[in-house]
C-alpha cells in the first residue's frame, strides 16, 4: 500500500505532466488506495497546499538549487515542493520528518541519485531558519511570490478592485472550501440522510439558507458510502444550489440546462420539481453526458434526458422551456480555492465573451413566452 506522501507525489506529477483536474484525480486516487482516513486527510492537505503555494515553493527551489530549474527532473521538483511546503506550512510535521521523508521519495520515483541534492537543499533552508530572502523584489512582484499569486493576477485585481480588496481576494484563495451536498428529497428526508452519513463517519449539518443543503466534513471516500450508493444526495456547491433556488422550477414545467455537466443544477431542479415535469440536460462532450445520465440513475430521477449539444449553435430540436439555465464557460477565477491549478493554467479568454453571448442568445430562443433564464458564471472578471 502506498504512503500518503507517495500518493501525493504521484498526483502532483500527473498534474504537471497531464494537466489533470485536481479534484477529479484526488478522488480517483483515494478510491484506488486503501489508505486510512488520517493518511487521506494528510495527502489531500499536502496535495492542495503544494498547488496553492507553487510559486513560493518554486522561488525557493530556484534560490537554493545549483541546477537550473528547467533541468531538474519533474519528480524531483515535486519532491522539493512537498518538502518546502511541509517545512513552511505544516506545523504538525517535524522538520526532520519533512526532510527525511522527502529524501526517501527519491527512491520511490527512481531518482536515487537525487537524494543528496534534495537533502542538501532542504537542510540548508533549515540552517537559514526557514527564512525567505526576497532580495530586491518589491510591490506586486514581491506580493506575487509571497502569496503565490501570478503577477498578472495581482496586477489585475489591484487595478479592478483596489489594493485592500485585492489583498482580500488573494488571501481568499488559500485553504479548502466547505463541501456541500443536496439531499435527494424526492426519496429521502434530510434528517434521515444526515443520520445515515453520520453512521458512516461523515459529518453532516443543515444549511440555514438553502432547503435540503447540507455541509459535509470527513468526506474522503464518500463515494463508497452506502448513502451515496443509495442515491441519498449529490455533491453540489452552495452557490450552484442558490442558482436553482433562484430558478425556482415548478411541478410539471420544462427546464433546459445548457452546459450542464457535471449536472448538479439538473439534479437539484428535478428534486425541487419532485421528479415531475421534464428536464433536458445538455453538454458538448459525450463523456460528460454519460456522467449526468449515470448520476440521474443513481439518484432515481426519471424526468432527466441527457444529450450532447453545442450550446453556441441553435438547435431547433430543443423543446421550448419554462426555465433555461446557462452556466457558461469562463476563466474560473471565482473558484480558485476549489481548483488552485487555475492560477497556473491561464487560458486565452479573448473569445469567452463571444461564446457566452452566443449561448445566451440561443437560450432566449428556447424560452416559452414569459419564460425565465438563469445565467451564471464562476468568474469575477470584469
For each feature predicted by the language model, list its residue ranges.
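S-adenosylmethionine
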Residues: 1-382
Amino acid at each position: 500500500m502506498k504512503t500518503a506522501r507517495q500518493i501525493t507525489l504521484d498526483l502532483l506529477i500527473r498534474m504537471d505532466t497531464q494537466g489533470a483536474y485536481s479534484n477529479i484525480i484526488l478522488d480517483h486516487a483515494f478510491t484506488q488506495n486503501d489508505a486510512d482516513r488520517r493518511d487521506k486527510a494528510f495527502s489531500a492537505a499536502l496535495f492542495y497546499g503544494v498547488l496553492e503555494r507553487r510559486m513560493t515553493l518554486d522561488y525557493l527551489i530556484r534560490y537554493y538549487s545549483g541546477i537550473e530549474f528547467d533541468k531538474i527532473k519533474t519528480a524531483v521538483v515535486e519532491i522539493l515542493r512537498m518538502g518546502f511546503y511541509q517545512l513552511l506550512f505544516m506545523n504538525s510535521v517535524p522538520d526532520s520528518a519533512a526532510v527525511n521523508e522527502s529524501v526517501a521519495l527519491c527512491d520511490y520515483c527512481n531518482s536515487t541519485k537525487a537524494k543528496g541534492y534534495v537533502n542538501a537543499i532542504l537542510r540548508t533552508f533549515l540552517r537559514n531558519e526557514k527564512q525567505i530572502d526576497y532580495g530586491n523584489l518589491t510591490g506586486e512582484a514581491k506580493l506575487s511570490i509571497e502569496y503565490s499569486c501570478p503577477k498578472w493576477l495581482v496586477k489585475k485585481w489591484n487595478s479592478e478592485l483596489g489594493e485592500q480588496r485585492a489583498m482580500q481576494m488573494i488571501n481568499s484563495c488559500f485553504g479548502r472550501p466547505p463541501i456541500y451536498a443536496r439531499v435527494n428529497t424526492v426519496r429521502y428526508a434530510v434528517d434521515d440522510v444526515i443520520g445515515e452519513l453520520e453512521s458512516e463517519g461523515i459529518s453532516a449539518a443543515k444549511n440555514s439558507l438553502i432547503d435540503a443543503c447540507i455541509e459535509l466534513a470527513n468526506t474522503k471516500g464518500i463515494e463508497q458510502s452506502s448513502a451515496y450508493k443509495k442515491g441519498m444526495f449529490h455533491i453540489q456547491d452552495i452557490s450552484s444550489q442558490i442558482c436553482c433556488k433562484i430558478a425556482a422550477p415548478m411541478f410539471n414545467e420544462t427546464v433546459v440546462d445548457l452546459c450542464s455537466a457535471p449536472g448538479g443544477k439538473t439534479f437539484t431542479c428535478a428534486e425541487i420539481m419532485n421528479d415531475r415535469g421534464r428536464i433536458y440536460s445538455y453538454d458538448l462532450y459525450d463523456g460528460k453526458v454519460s456522467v449526468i445520465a449515470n448520476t440521474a440513475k443513481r439518484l432515481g430521477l426519471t424526468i432527466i434526458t441527457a444529450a450532447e449539444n453545442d450550446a453556441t449553435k441553435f438547435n431547433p430540436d430543443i423543446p421550448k422551456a419554462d426555465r433555461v439555465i446557462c452556466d457558461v464557460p469562463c476563466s474560473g477565477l471565482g473558484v480558485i480555492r476549489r481548483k488552485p491549478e487555475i492560477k497556473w493554467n491561464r487560458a486565452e479568454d479573448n473569445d469567452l465573451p463571444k461564446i457566452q453571448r452566443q449561448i445566451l442568445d440561443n437560450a432566449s430562443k428556447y424560452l416559452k413566452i414569459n419564460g425565465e433564464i438563469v445565467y451564471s458564471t464562476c468568474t469575477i472578471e470584469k
